[in-house]
From Swiss-Prot:
It comes from Symbiobacterium thermophilum (strain DSM 24528 / JCM 14929 / IAM 14863 / T). The gene is cheD. GO terms for molecular function: protein-glutamine glutaminase activity. Belongs to the CheD family. Pfam families: CheD. The keyword Hydrolase applies. This is Probable chemoreceptor glutamine deamidase CheD. InterPro entries: CheD-like_sf (IPR038592), Chemorcpt_Glu_NH3ase_CheD (IPR005659), Cytotoxic_necrot_fac-like_cat (IPR011324). It is an enzyme of class 3 (hydrolase).
């Protein structure tokens, strides 16, 4: 693993990678959703760290394209196609969307994790991209990794170990 280059994808960020040694990582996903998109033929991938479900929540303020599910998926698909990926070959895997606050159970509008999860699924459906695997929901945080060389996606959780999506 020492020859791999870990690249953190921070809150609201979107990163595209095309080198075999690159590993894109979203650390500490709580209510946020980490979305990995990958073209297995040309081995190009992207990761988006979605913070909120919809860009209308920004009220006209400038925000990074990955902050919202709708703009994040749109920007990631465009960036991947620009880098040489084929929209029709893109596959998606996602993790996160947890309910991190107990208050969320009383008002669905406050359950940002569930809203992020649904918004990511809807944005992918609009772009006709298959969500082939996910680890979303629950009440615990996760870390998501995308290995560009293989397209392998790992989810790590404190106390629950690591598994492949």
């Amino acid at each position: 693993m020492s020859d791999r280059r870990l690249e953190a994808v921070g809150l609201g960020e979107l990163k595209v990678a095309d080198r075999p040694d690159q590993v894109l990582v979203c650390y500490g996903l709580g209510s946020c959703v980490g979305l990995a998109l990958y073209d297995p033929v040309v081995r190009i991938g992207a990761m988006v760290h979605v913070v909120l479900p919809d860009s209308s929540m920004g009220r006209g303020r400038e925000a990074p394209p990955g902050k919202y599910a709708d703009t994040g998926v749109e920007a990631a698909v465009a960036a991947l196609v620009d880098a040489g990926a084929s929209r029709s070959r893109l596959i998606a895997k996602a993790a996160g969307g947890a309910r991190m606050l107990r208050l969320a159970g009383s008002n669905p509008q406050l359950d940002i994790g569930a809203r992020n999860t649904e918004a990511v699924r809807a944005a992918l459906a609009r772009h006709q991209i298959r969500l082939v695997a996910e680890d979303m929901g629950g009440t615990y945080g996760r870390t998501l990794q995308l290995f560009i060389e293989t397209g392998r996606v790992l989810v790590s959780t404190v106390g629950r170990g690591e598994h492949e999506l």
